[in-house]
Amino acid sequence: MKPPALTPRLLLRAYALGIFPMAESRDDPEIHWIDPRHRGIFPLDGFHISRSLARRIRRMDWRVSVDEDFAATVEACADREETWINPTIFRLYVELHALGHAHSLEVREGETLVGGVYGVTLGRAFFGESMFSHRTDASKVALAFLIDRLRAGGFTLFDTQFLTPHLASLGAIEIRRSDYHQRLTEALEGNASFTPEGYWADPASVVQRNSQTS
């Protein structure tokens, strides 16, 4: 019996159960479902902005945007020697974006996309999928603006899937699967907005708000 076709709705049900899809490589047509024993998360009050990053944000001439070019952000995340984003996964996230359940935050230098992050939203949970950086600190800037936005929008869970040394240096932690599922259940019981009404994120305010909570 053939497995059911992978659709955006099926993907959302998987996220609600705490599992997410990955491919072995760009050319691997198979989709593997992952439920790690230990899960990486970003405590929304624990993002660490170093002095150098704070200076970078305050003085930056980059522009931060949201959902201006979701597909290009995913493509940039996949544009590396090894990637888990195959054509099927790319298509699914673009379809989730059209449904309002996937968003991108972009960092631009002029009109050039130099950094960004994208993920899936469900209830009060944000599932970070991937990020990229074509300039020094561009992905860190994207994360700082993303976390500020998630807090303002009422999110309670930022799932990073795995914990990397880079994420750990910025304040991400690792928790057990059982703890993660409990937090996920609680996050799914409410609603949040990725585009909260009246929200404004100028660089100085982002640094100040992150400094007050970290």
Curated annotation (Swiss-Prot):
<dbReference type="InterPro" id="IPR042203">
    <property type="entry name" value="Leu/Phe-tRNA_Trfase_C"/>
</dbReference>
<dbReference type="GO" id="GO:0005737">
    <property type="term" value="C:cytoplasm"/>
</dbReference>
<keyword id="KW-0012">Acyltransferase</keyword>
<dbReference type="Pfam" id="PF03588">
    <property type="entry name" value="Leu_Phe_trans"/>
</dbReference>
<dbReference type="InterPro" id="IPR016181">
    <property type="entry name" value="Acyl_CoA_acyltransferase"/>
</dbReference>
<keyword id="KW-0963">Cytoplasm</keyword>
<comment type="similarity">
    <text>Belongs to the L/F-transferase family.</text>
</comment>
<dbReference type="InterPro" id="IPR004616">
    <property type="entry name" value="Leu/Phe-tRNA_Trfase"/>
</dbReference>
<comment type="function">
    <text>Functions in the N-end rule pathway of protein degradation where it conjugates Leu, Phe and, less efficiently, Met from aminoacyl-tRNAs to the N-termini of proteins containing an N-terminal arginine or lysine.</text>
</comment>
<dbReference type="GO" id="GO:0030163">
    <property type="term" value="P:protein catabolic process"/>
</dbReference>
<dbReference type="GO" id="GO:0008914">
    <property type="term" value="F:leucyl-tRNA--protein transferase activity"/>
</dbReference>
<keyword id="KW-0808">Transferase</keyword>
<protein>
    <recommendedName>
        <fullName>Leucyl/phenylalanyl-tRNA--protein transferase</fullName>
        <ecNumber>2.3.2.6</ecNumber>
    </recommendedName>
</protein>
